[in-house]
Amino acid sequence: MLNEIFNKQKTQSEKSLEALKKDFTTLRTGKINTHILDHITVDYYGNQTPLNQVATVLASDASTISITPWEKPLLKTIESAIAAANIGVNPNNDGESVKLFFPPMTREQREENVKQAKAMGEKAKVSIRNIRKDANDAVKKLEKDKAISEDEAKKAYDEVQKLTDVYTTKIDESVKSKESELLKV
């Protein structure tokens, strides 16, 4: 019973940590990453389709992304979807592909991204605390139903807190690591 609660807490906490790392990929660092375009969708035969499912998206160098659609008529659609996404660059259509040239980041942009990373970390910590609350509620219910003793419940609460501390530390480390990556010129 208790192991199920702990395993569920671990699984959910791991998902929160993975979600944080996925969120971090949307932040621009000194070196350009194609994940910055992951949230962009284009109209493809009436359906909103992720950009990477209708085109090849490559980082040609540290500051340029090249998007080559699999069907030429999509060039204009891709260009307007990127312009509408407001990612800080203007798309450049050369007739074959859409190129995005990212200027070097300013100190202010880097600091703004650090703020966003910290906010993402805080959101992940809130998620971890909610997971802890759910686990504690499950232990409390077992204790109330007399399925476990008061001593077992106390040990279970301690274990839930230990897991919470472990994942909170992992989140702090991830945020610190991302912060140093963002500030590196």
Curated annotation (Swiss-Prot):
<keyword id="KW-0648">Protein biosynthesis</keyword>
<keyword id="KW-0963">Cytoplasm</keyword>
<dbReference type="GO" id="GO:0002184">
    <property type="term" value="P:cytoplasmic translational termination"/>
</dbReference>
<dbReference type="Pfam" id="PF01765">
    <property type="entry name" value="RRF"/>
</dbReference>
<dbReference type="GO" id="GO:0005829">
    <property type="term" value="C:cytosol"/>
</dbReference>
<dbReference type="GO" id="GO:0043023">
    <property type="term" value="F:ribosomal large subunit binding"/>
</dbReference>
<comment type="similarity">
    <text>Belongs to the RRF family.</text>
</comment>
<dbReference type="InterPro" id="IPR036191">
    <property type="entry name" value="RRF_sf"/>
</dbReference>
<dbReference type="InterPro" id="IPR023584">
    <property type="entry name" value="Ribosome_recyc_fac_dom"/>
</dbReference>
<protein>
    <recommendedName>
        <fullName>Ribosome-recycling factor</fullName>
    </recommendedName>
</protein>
<comment type="function">
    <text>Responsible for the release of ribosomes from messenger RNA at the termination of protein biosynthesis. May increase the efficiency of translation by recycling ribosomes from one round of translation to another.</text>
</comment>
<dbReference type="InterPro" id="IPR002661">
    <property type="entry name" value="Ribosome_recyc_fac"/>
</dbReference>
